[in-house]
C-alpha cells in the first residue's frame, strides 16, 4: 500500500497575509519530494495592489516561492483579459485549464491542459479546468469580452484520461468548476481518482466519494490548508481516502513576506504615476448625494447609450483625490464589477430609488455578494437628467414624470443587474449588455473631462419642496 498526500488551497482571492501563515505550515509539514501541492484557482484577485500592478505576476511568484506544483486557472485569473493572463502563463509555472481557449477555440499561449508529475515512483496526471457557465449569451458575455472561450469540460476530461492512459498511475482533476460541476464530473467521467475543487468556496470537513472519485475543497480566503490523503494498492487503485481542512496558527513566512514586499514595491511604482490633476477633490458619502458618485453616474450616462444611469454608492469606497493615479482609483473602486446596460420598468426604478433612502438598504452588508467590495450597499446615485422629489416621491427623467409601466434602458452594474442588495432590480436579462470596462477603468478614461465635474454639481435629490 502507498500513501499519496495532496495539499491544496483554493479561492485565496489575494488574502496574502493569511496565505503567508499557510506557507509557514507548508514549510514544516509538506515533503516536496513526495507530496503534491496544488491551488484550484482564484488565487490572484485584482483587488490587490500587488496583483493589479504586476498584472498577476506577483501572485505567481508567491506560488513559486511556496513550492506549489500547479494552479488551475480561475475566473479571477482571466477576467483581467488576455494580456494579463499571458503575462502570468509566461512565468515558468504550470497554469492549467483544459477548457479555456481563445475566442476562435485556438489554444492560449502557455495554458496547459494537464501535466504529469512523478513522486516516489508514482506517476500522477493533473488536469485543470476553469468554470463553465453555459452557452447562453449572458453566460458567455464576460469571456467573450476577454477574447476567450470556455468549453464544457466533462468530455474534455474524459478524453485526456483516455488519451494519456498508460502514462500515469493516479489522476487528479484540479477544478475551478464549483462543487456542483465537480459532482457532475465525478458521476459521469470514468477513471478519475480525485478532484481538488474551487470556485464555490465549499468547506468540506471530509472528502466526498462519488462513483469511485474522491472530492475535496477547502473553503476560501486562505482560511484553511486542505489535505487529501489517498491510500493506493500495488495496482494503483485508490482503496480509501481521507480529507481535512487545517486551520493554521503559525507565524508569517519570511520568504513569502519578502516576495510580497518586492512585488508590491514594483506594483506601487507602476500604479503611482500621476495621470492628471483635477480642479478639486471629489468627496464621497455612503448615505448622501455627493460629488464622487454624481461624477460617476454622469460619466456612465454620457459613455453608454441609455435613458439614465443608476448605481449604488457602495461601488466606491472613498472619495477621489485631485491627483489621479491608478493606485488611487484601485483604492476608490477595487470591485471587479462591469458596466452593464439593462432594461428595467419604471416601477423597478422607482422602488429602488425610494428604497435607497432607507437606512436598512443604505447600511446593508452581506458576505454572500459575489464580487462586491464595499462594506455597505449604499444609497443610489443617478445621472443629472433625473430629478427626485424625496418628500412627494415624484421622479422625473428629462423633465418628464417617470412612467411605472414604461421600460427604460439603464446603465448600471452587473451587481445591481443581478438584484444584489436592491432585490427589486433583479431578473433583467432582456437586452442586457455587459461592457468590458471595470468602474475604475471608466473613471480613468473619463475623469479628466471637466464638463463632468461641472454637471456633478447639479442636485438630483430634493427635499422640503
What are these regions (language model features)?
Residues 15-18, 320-465:
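Feature captures C-terminal
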Residues 194, 218, 225-226, 299-305, ...:
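Charge-rich, low-complexity terminal tails
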Residues 175, 313, 412-414:
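Structural motif
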Residues 8-10, 280-283, 337-338, 424-425:
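Glycine- and acidic
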Residues 1-247, 289-299, 309:
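Acidic, metal/ion-coordinating pockets
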Residues 233-324, 447-465:
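A short C-terminal boundary segment appended to hydrolase-like catalytic domains
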Residues 135-139, 227, 250-258, 320-321, ...:
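A short, polar/proline- and glycine-enriched secondary-structure boundary/capping micro-motif
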Residues 26-30, 89, 161-168, 179, ...:
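Structural signal for hydrophobic packing residues in well-ordered secondary-structure cores
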Amino acid at each position: 500500500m502507498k500513501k499519496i498526500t495532496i495539499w491544496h488551497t483554493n479561492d485565496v482571492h489575494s488574502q496574502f497575509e493569511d496565505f503567508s501563515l499557510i506557507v509557514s505550515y507548508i514549510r514544516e509539514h509538506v515533503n516536496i519530494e513526495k507530496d503534491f501541492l496544488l491551488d484550484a484557482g482564484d488565487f490572484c484577485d485584482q483587488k490587490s495592489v500587488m496583483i493589479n500592478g504586476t498584472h498577476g505576476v506577483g501572485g505567481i511568484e508567491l506560488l513559486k516561492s511556496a513550492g506549489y506544483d500547479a494552479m488551475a486557472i480561475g475566473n479571477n485569473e482571466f477576467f483581467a483579459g488576455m494580456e494579463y493572463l499571458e503575462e502570468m502563463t509566461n512565468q515558468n509555472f504550470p497554469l492549467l485549464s483544459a477548457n479555456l481557449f481563445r475566442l476562435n477555440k485556438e489554444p492560449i499561449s502557455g495554458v496547459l491542459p494537464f501535466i504529469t508529475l512523478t513522486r516516489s515512483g508514482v506517476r500522477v496526471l493533473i488536469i485543470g479546468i476553469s468554470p463553465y457557465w453555459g452557452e447562453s449569451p449572458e453566460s458567455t458575455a464576460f469571456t467573450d469580452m476577454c477574447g476567450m472561450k470556455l468549453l464544457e469540460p466533462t468530455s474534455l476530461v474524459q478524453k485526456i484520461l483516455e488519451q494519456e492512459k498508460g502514462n500515469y498511475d493516479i489522476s487528479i482533476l484540479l477544478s475551478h468548476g464549483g462543487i456542483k460541476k465537480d459532482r457532475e464530473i465525478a458521476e459521469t467521467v470514468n477513471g478519475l481518482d480525485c478532484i481538488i475543487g474551487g470556485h464555490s468556496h465549499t468547506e468540506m470537513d471530509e472528502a466526498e466519494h462519488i462513483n469511485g472519485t474522491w472530492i475535496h475543497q477547502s473553503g476560501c480566503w486562505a482560511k484553511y490548508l486542505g489535505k487529501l490523503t489517498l491510500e493506493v494498492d500495488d495496482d494503483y487503485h485508490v482503496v480509501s481516502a481521507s480529507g481535512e481542512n487545517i486551520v493554521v496558527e503559525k507565524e508569517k513566512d519570511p520568504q513569502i513576506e519578502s516576495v510580497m514586499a518586492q512585488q508590491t514595491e514594483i506594483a506601487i511604482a507602476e500604479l503611482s504615476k500621476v495621470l492628471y490633476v483635477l480642479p478639486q477633490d471629489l468627496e464621497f458619502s455612503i448615505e448622501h448625494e455627493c460629488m464622487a458618485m454624481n461624477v460617476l453616474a454622469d460619466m456612465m450616462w454620457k459613455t453608454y447609450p441609455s435613458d439614465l444611469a443608476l448605481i449604488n454608492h457602495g461601488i466606491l469606497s472613498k472619495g477621489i483625490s485631485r491627483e489621479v493615479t491608478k493606485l488611487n482609483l484601485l483604492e476608490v473602486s477595487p470591485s471587479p464589477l462591469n458596466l452593464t446596460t439593462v432594461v428595467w420598468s419604471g416601477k423597478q426604478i422607482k422602488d429602488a430609488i425610494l428604497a435607497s433612502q432607507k437606512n436598512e438598504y443604505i447600511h446593508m452588508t452581506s458576505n454572500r455578494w459575489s464580487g462586491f467590495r464595499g462594506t455597505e450597499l449604499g444609497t443610489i446615485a443617478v445621472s443629472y437628467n433625473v430629478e427626485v422629489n424625496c418628500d412627494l416621491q415624484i421622479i422625473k427623467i428629462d423633465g418628464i414624470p417617470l412612467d411605472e409601466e414604461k421600460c427604460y434602458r439603464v446603465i448600471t452594474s452587473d451587481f445591481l443587474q443581478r438584484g444584489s442588495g436592491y432585490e427589486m432590480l433583479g431578473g433583467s436579462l432582456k437586452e442586457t449588455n455587459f461592457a468590458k470596462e471595470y468602474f475604475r477603468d471608466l473613471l480613468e478614461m473619463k475623469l479628466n473631462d471637466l464638463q463632468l465635474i461641472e454637471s456633478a454639481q447639479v442636485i438630483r435629490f430634493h427635499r422640503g419642496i
